[in-house]
Amino acid sequence: MISGHLQTPDSSDHSGDEAKLTKPSGLESKTNELWSSDLEEELESRIMQPATFSSILKQFPSISEETIISKIMSNKNCDKNNWKKKIYCYRYFLQPSKEEPDVGNMKSLVEKLEKLKLKKWSASEIEQLFCNYLEDLTTSAVKVSIPGKTLDEVAAAVNNIHPRPRWTRKEIECLIKNENDFKKLEKDLFVRDLDSIKKKIRRDNLSIQNEIQDSEKKSPQSTDSNNKDSSRDLSRKERDQLKKLLSKPICFSELLAKFPGHSWEYIAREIIQLDSSEDNTIWLKKIYYYCVVYSISVDKEITKYIGGGNRIYEKVRSDWSKIKTLDFFKDWSLQEFERLYCFAFHDLTKSALTKNFPSKNLNDICKVVNISFPKVPYTDREMKYLERHLDTPMQTLENNLPFRSRGSIHKKLEALKALTETTEQKQPPTKTRPKNEEEKNVENAAYMKELIMFDLTLEAIENTFPSEPIEEIIKEIKNSEIFDPLSFTRGEKELMAKLVKKGNLIDDCFDYFPLREEEFIRSKYAEAEYVSGRKMKFNTPEERLAYEAKWTLFNMGKQEYGRGNRRSTKRYCEIDELSKLEQEASVKRSKKKIELTEEELEQRRKRSEHFRLCRLKKLEEKREKYRIEKAKRLEKIAAGLIKPSTSGYELKDIVTSAEYFQSIVGDKQKVQEGQKRKRIQTEYFAPEFIEKPKAVKLKTTKRQAEKNKIKKQLKREAQLKIKKKKTIAPKKGKRRVKTNNGIIEEIKDVYKLSSEPYVESEVEEEDEEEDYISPYDPPDIISDSQVKLNGRHLYISSFYKELPEIPELKFVSLPHMEMSGNDITVAKQIMTTANDDILYDDCLAYEIVAQHIKSYRDLPISFPPVLDPITHELNSANIVRIRFFLYPEHYESFMLASPKSNELDPVHEIAKLFMIQYSLYFSHSDTLKKIITEDYCHKLEHSVEENDFGEFMFVVDKWNQLVMKLSPNLASVQNILGLKEDINEAPRAYLNQQEVSIPTNSDLKIETFYDEIMYESASPLFNPINSNLEIDSESAPIPLGEVEIPNNVIEEINEKMPDNYIPDFFRRLKEKTEVSRYAMQQILLRVYSRVVSTDSRKLRSYKAFTAETYGELLPSFTSEVLEKLNLLPTQKFYDLGSGVGNTTFQAALEFGACSSGGCEIMEHASKLTELQAGLIQKHLAVLGLQKLNLDFALHESFVGNEKVRASCLDCDVLIINNYLFDGQLNDEVGKLLYGLRPGTKIVSLRNFISPRYRATFDTVFDFLSVEKHEMSDIMSVSWTANKVPYYISTVEETIPREYLSREETKETSGKSKSVSPVGEIENVAAAMMTPPTDSSESEIIKN
């Protein structure tokens, strides 16, 4: 049977097999057969820890006691002498029936431990105390192992065993670890005083040093481990938190999340050192499983640093390789695998697995666990479940324990039942000598006196005398001389107050006070109820009267308890009667109305009228009397017989002011007679005005200036309308007589004079206010807004590796500016073609100015002219080149010129390039934002305004120098330095030698950039000092020749980049959770200005007011709408009628749509889309951003296009600019989108649903619910500057009832979108016609 059981694959639990060992001890051969190497390892790990013998037996409940003893004694690594003593202690206190021979003078120690029972120490606590006494007397270990006792009680017990206990191994380790920290040693070694600790250190100094040297020899990697763990040590609070977490069933990754400032190696080592559990290999396995699952390399040094376990690590690696071969491996996350591995140690019940892994199959869970644990030991939760369900049917147990077989559960149940029986039988009888009757009586009398003095509640009596009948104790207390039946003890008062606060009724309180009479308890309840709070609200006056009477009666007699029972009994009866009266009076009763006859009603009216007339008569008499007295008084005042009365307040004010003016210089001190007035110089206090530095504002762009102008015009018009409404006179039938104001207004109308001067002033005041800037249209980084990344990777994938790297790009040169056959320059053709070629010199901006030279004028006179004065050709000294941060070998060329109209502005483009690269790489720092805006953008614009070409070139050189200093692409920087090429030599040659300024490190503020980018500030001495520096001795003679100007040593030295700069730079990029909306929109506008703006005339050649008329949705429109829809990186986007692809590019770049597409039929617009797509991908590559996933259908109509239909049905958000769609084209859109998923959003410029719309059952419009919105800002579309409305349509599950007629409602009830009705319903095309639009939509379309 035994061998057959071992071969059963389901019974993988070795503890089920160990149930065989509960048989008699004569079967030692069978026991040896069942004893496995895993059990041997587990037992060895247990006995090497400070554990009691009873805890070892509980861990192996199915194995006999003799077997475990023999295994412990046969182990070579354990301290056999200590284990003999622990076994003796266990059998003496927990198995007193067995007699053991004396081991190492144990009888004397046991007699001392026996005395602890008198101090209410249990047998298990005594055994644990003895274990700590032998192996670990540190504070942390005692607190964990004996939680029911204080440290003072434990120290007293230890001193009772021996006044000078020997030093345990753990105490010596603590002493070695904290040799110089006496405060910590005194706290951690609570049994020892400070003198004994110091003596131990002095006496055993040599041995301690030897132990330290031995430990260093054994662990030569200690210095390496310190280098690995560069973080600070755990604080005391963090260490306590870590100890608490170790006892919880959590995995290693969850524990690491609680301590983010420390490395995993350091936390792992601390766990192994602090782990006081019986099996300390559990956390070691969790740590190595974490390393294997998350592909963290572990070498021999790390294993030694953590604490060993090479064999465990190799086993975990082999198990993980097997798990990877499972079919369902890809459906699980790494965190789920790690959590399941953790659950295998703590809880493998079905309820826990289904709760924590709801989406996983139980069979898959079993497969994963069985690979890592071929023999799964019973977890603590499984054991507790079996202990609680010993009598539960076997089928229920098998269902709730999926990893256990029927035989394994049966054996475990038998072992648990046998263990409970043996523990009940093995209760240790008291070995103390029996007490005399006199001693018992004296002890009981002391306890009883303490009860009578402090607490006579039922709970206190039962706790003090648990084994004696409660009736006898109550009789003895009542017969005691010191017992007072008419006074509550402190414990009884506190209990009564608690019962009253909880709201317990008085009848429920009698049982808590067994020594008190019922009447006395009632009085005390009333007293506590009164003390707790007086009643303030009453339903009726009678209830209030009864309550106050009871309260008065209670106060009158509460001190008369000792006068006799007759009076108190009468008072209590009165209180009860008043309580009943109060309860009856609290009920509101409505008064019965008395019905009166007509005669009685007439008499009542006469009486009320009579009383009213009498009151009026008396009031009139009083008024007449007051008039007469007032007239007489006024006559006397006029005759001078009575002085007018003065109020007391007026007199006080006069006296106070007189005293003030008599004071000395206003010090409120009255001048005495004969005192001279002091002459004190007057002090004048002027308020201090601190001028706040004005924030630097960048030059307003033409678009922003146009928006501000339009907003002001709209405000003026609104104010004029309000003014006109106020001046319009109301219509009246009679002829109105003209007033002076009316005549003045008529004159102003005739002579056309301005009648609203205040309106202009109001407008001027409003002009001075700051203009509102929309968050969806930021003009610069100062007023920028952020877009959430929502978990997407903004940069290329190589930036997110453990060792980030910058990929190489294929840069090509362009020797001459040439035109290709299709009127496109070679440079533009290279940059817009869909391949990997990128120009070293991106000269598209230069070509725009060169090809439209008539639209530009020269900058101020200090700047080079656009044309060479001699050759009248383009001036090469006017070309400025700007480098890129990630690829310094790539730069962009600009021809310096001022646009006459709305053309590309080179100066603004350079500033824009500065701000884009700040937003992408340094946006985490406001300090760097200030440097970029003030030192670069603002000074660039200021140099043009102030006609200073020298300052302009200084800013350009400073930027290029900064890129060379900060670029993480070290290979490119070295190549550039090797070539020694000056890309801006020609424009710099235009300046005089005195105007040329070379930027220094202080100009670049390079230290500030390092400090802001790096997580830890670089030391000012991170660079080595030049070796050629020499220091003269003090005694050396001073030469009398010419004194040379000393070099700036700091600028010569600080040329080296800090070591952690590049890793910290890429770490900043990885931790980005938001991206600049300004940067995203400007990247799109840069591409648009180089491709579409130069070739936009053909877009206006289409017929006006048709579906092919071209109109654009500007970036602010797309940003606001898509943010309102919350477009996520996991969603798809499509634009029906995408034009040149602007919205498609923006959805992919700004919001990270995983797929962004569009359909366009116009030839020229499709061609421009292809050029824009090629250029934007190359711009993103140079900036280090991810490529866009685009899906265009160009040169095609969406009508009847299955490819476009498939793309639309798969997307989550659609934009349709149907501003000029006719009814037939709208109908085609509905049929094309028929079948969209519920929840899909459609954005349109006009409503697809007309008034009184009826469902046709062949279009998506049947399922739309429409919401109307309006743009928050002006100039969001290309054809009007006003705020435009737009519509968001949501695809519903079913057809709304308002779209159906009564008959159709009956027929289609219960039908949803998935089952469209197919009936003989005519397709009413008129229902799909575009409805009448709002007034705001009726504007003339501007081409």
Curated annotation (Swiss-Prot):
Q: Which domain of life is it from?
A: Eukaryota
**Gene Ontology process terms (BP):** DNA damage checkpoint signaling; DNA repair; methylation; subtelomeric heterochromatin formation
Q: Where is the composition biased (Polar residues)?
A: 1-10, 420-430
Q: Report the GO terms under cellular component.
A: chromosome, telomeric region; nucleus
Q: What are the EC numbers? A: 2.1.1.360
Tell me which UniProt keywords the record has, alphabetically: Chromatin regulator, Methyltransferase, Nucleus, Repeat, S-adenosyl-L-methionine, Transcription, Transcription regulation, Transferase
The DOT1 domain is annotated at 987-1304
Q: Which reactions appear under catalytic activity for this entry?
A: L-lysyl(79)-[histone H3] + 3 S-adenosyl-L-methionine = N(6),N(6),N(6)-trimethyl-L-lysyl(79)-[histone H3] + 3 S-adenosyl-L-homocysteine + 3 H(+)
Per UniProt, subcellular location reads as: Nucleus
Main localization (coarse): nucleus
Q: Give the matching InterPro entries.
A: DOT1_dom (IPR025789), H3-K79_meTrfase (IPR030445), SAM-dependent_MTases_sf (IPR029063)
Tagged with keyword Ligase: no
What is the regulatory mechanism acting on its activity? Ubiquitination of histone H2B to form H2BK123ub1 is required for efficient DOT1 methyltransferase activity on histone H3.
- Annotated segments matching region Disordered: 1-29, 210-236, 418-439
Composition bias of kind Basic and acidic residues appears in: 11-21, 226-236
Q: Which PROSITE patterns does this one have?
A: DOT1
On whether Repeat is a keyword of this UniProt record, the answer is yes
Alphabetized Pfam families for the sequence: DOT1
> Which residues participate in S-adenosyl-L-methionine binding?
1110-1113, 1133-1142, 1160, 1197-1198
Additional remark text:
In contrast to other lysine histone methyltransferases, it does not contain a SET domain, suggesting the existence of another mechanism for methylation of lysine residues of histones.
Write out the similarity annotation.
Answer: Belongs to the class I-like SAM-binding methyltransferase superfamily. DOT1 family.
Per the entry, what this protein does is: Histone methyltransferase that specifically trimethylates histone H3 to form H3K79me3. This methylation is required for telomere silencing and for the pachytene checkpoint during the meiotic cell cycle by allowing the recruitment of RAD9 to double strand breaks. Nucleosomes are preferred as substrate compared to free histone.
Q: What is this protein called?
A: Histone-lysine N-methyltransferase, H3 lysine-79 specific
